[in-house]
Amino acid sequence: MKFSFFTLFPSLISGYFEDSILKRARDEGRIEIEWVNFREFSQDRFKKVDEYQIGGGAGLVIEPRVVTQAISELKAKNQDAKILFLLPAGKPFTHQDACRLAQKESHLVLVCGRYEGIDERAIEANADEVFCMGDYILTGGEIAALALCDAVSRQIPGVLGNEESLQGESFDSFLLEAPVFARSKTPEGLSAPSEYSKGNHAKICALKRRLSLAKTQYYRPDLYKKYKIQESDKGKK
């Protein structure tokens, strides 16, 4: 899988892949990372890429020409590249999206917004999908793009050292993962559930299921509602 980050600040991207799992995945050739600076496509002598808004308003906007030209040059090399914009106005990115992109795509282009945003004409002309990472505003799309890249990458075979790590994770089937406990000395007054250490795997699985349901219902009632609908649909088949 190849990831191309279109950004005004490449240094925000490069450091993320210098440690841990994604560094190993990159070294092993399971993922390929590149970053493209929009300023390279500016015809302004000072490499300016932003402009004031039509109709007024606070903040500068990244002009459409530099975005479209950057994407056009990449698409000329790979027509199959999927163009994703990371913007507050996008649809919520989910675990299901991460799995889908990992399974179906080979090259993701992650366009990172900045300032007051990207000219809407560039989005309409180039975006295959527009994603948002949550109901909050970041200073730029780079953090969101890295989060998307991380979520997709770990679904690629071989990226995680233990493939079992993907099983039963939070958001699988709209449920949060059950609590986990380290095999270390118990802090005073903070014992783990006794069933976890008794070796009866059937009972452990049943307990984890109950705890997963309770955790989801408490922390994420929105997900729990989706889970209940999913289970209801299964019963109708």
Swiss-Prot record:
Protein source organism: Wolinella succinogenes (strain ATCC 29543 / DSM 1740 / CCUG 13145 / JCM 31913 / LMG 7466 / NCTC 11488 / FDC 602W)
Record GO biological process: tRNA N1-guanine methylation
Similarity comment text for this entry: Belongs to the RNA methyltransferase TrmD family.
Record keyword Ribonucleoprotein present: no
EC nos: 2.1.1.228
Subcellular location: Cytoplasm
Pfam families, A to Z: tRNA_m1G_MT
Cellular component terms per the entry's GO annotation: cytosol
UniProt GO molecular function: tRNA (guanine(37)-N1)-methyltransferase activity
Complex formation: Homodimer.
Binding site for S-adenosyl-L-methionine: G113, M133, G134, D135, Y136, I137, L138
Chief place where the protein resides: cytoplasm
Protein purpose: Specifically methylates guanosine-37 in various tRNAs.
Protein name: tRNA (guanine-N(1)-)-methyltransferase
PANTHER family: TRNA (GUANINE-N(1)-)-METHYLTRANSFERASE
Source superkingdom: Bacteria
Keywords: Cytoplasm, Methyltransferase, S-adenosyl-L-methionine, Transferase, tRNA processing
Catalytic activity: guanosine(37) in tRNA + S-adenosyl-L-methionine = N(1)-methylguanosine(37) in tRNA + S-adenosyl-L-homocysteine + H(+)
